[in-house]
Amino acid sequence: MGQKINPTGFRLAVSRNWASRWYASNRDFAGMLAEDIKVREYLKAKLKNAAVSRVLIERPAKNARITIFSARPGVVIGKKGEDIENLKKELSRQLGVPVAVNIEEVRKPEIDAKLIADSITQQLEKRIMFRRAMKRAMQNAMRLGALGIKIMSSGRLNGIEIARCEWYREGRVPLHTLRADIDYGTSEAKTTYGVIGVKVWVYKGDTLGRGESPGAKLDAAPSDEERKPRGPRRDARPGSDRPAPRGARAPRAPAGGTNTAPADGSDKPAEATPGSDAPKTTVKRVRKAAPAAAADGTKTE
């Protein structure tokens, strides 16, 4: 069922970390979780045009720290930081504690799954063909270093009456491999025909540690210092001849000595002579000649 499960939840505590990092008792957990959901919905609506990839919420003692990962940090900050100050006040009012807002820039939005899905949905709402939008996003992702990408759109594609699902994949997307860094994102396009859902999987490489970005590569090439010097070639080693080719075999020696033909001229093989140093016996077979005809023409019996 690796194709069905959420790739982010499948890799939590293995190669991924949580998007909300705080601890609460059983009595306070539900209320704090509801606050997190409201904050994320508010930021999604408020920063719709800021290309927000994800939101990280941390809660130290009687405080809150929210990190916004965006491809357009200038839109979030606003002129002279006015927008971000208003954002802090609103978030502090919702959470009831002082809030610190940090902005992190997404360097490559073309390989971020959430931003790819949002870009495709915006194009679908502008009545652009879904196949063209999907293939263009795949080409940009592979060009900027993604090892594989898969995009799936489902709904009333092109306004058809019966909803269907269509997906494209390029490269490899190992969903069952836990160490694989799979970035997963979804988005919805609200069209006149209904809602079209878009899912994106991006394979960025293998990771060893737990975090948001790919860690050390498992198949990284060793450095020059780690490489051991190679020995001489086989045909250049002193005191050794060049080895025979793999396919050639040496002739097999007889196990019990040499076999000789019988002296009586029969077809039966003679018994092996004991020892390989025994002298070889040569047997010459003589064919009986027919009697010559008489000189006077008479037959001889």
From Swiss-Prot:
Domain of life: Bacteria
GO molecular function: mRNA binding; rRNA binding; structural constituent of ribosome
Keyword rRNA-binding listed: yes
Similarity section: Belongs to the universal ribosomal protein uS3 family.
Composition bias, Basic and acidic residues: 224-244
Region (Disordered) location: 211-301
Keywords: Ribonucleoprotein, Ribosomal protein, RNA-binding, rRNA-binding
Bias (Low complexity): 245-257
Subunit structure: Part of the 30S ribosomal subunit. Forms a tight complex with proteins S10 and S14.
SUPFAM superfamilies in UniProt: Prokaryotic type KH domain (KH-domain type II) (SSF54814), Ribosomal protein S3 C-terminal domain (SSF54821)
Protein name: Small ribosomal subunit protein uS3
GO CC term (a single one): cytosolic small ribosomal subunit
Function: Binds the lower part of the 30S subunit head. Binds mRNA in the 70S ribosome, positioning it for translation.
All copies of domain KH type-2, residue ranges: 39-107
Stored HAMAP family: Ribosomal_uS3_B
InterPro entries (UniProt xref): KH_dom (IPR004087), KH_dom-like_a/b (IPR015946), KH_dom_type_2 (IPR004044), KH_sf_prok-type (IPR009019), Ribosomal_S3_C_sf (IPR036419), Ribosomal_uS3_bac-typ (IPR005704), Ribosomal_uS3_C (IPR001351), Ribosomal_uS3_CS (IPR018280)
One BP annotation, GO: translation
Matching Gene3D superfamilies: 3.30.300.20, Ribosomal protein S3, C-terminal domain (3.30.1140.32)
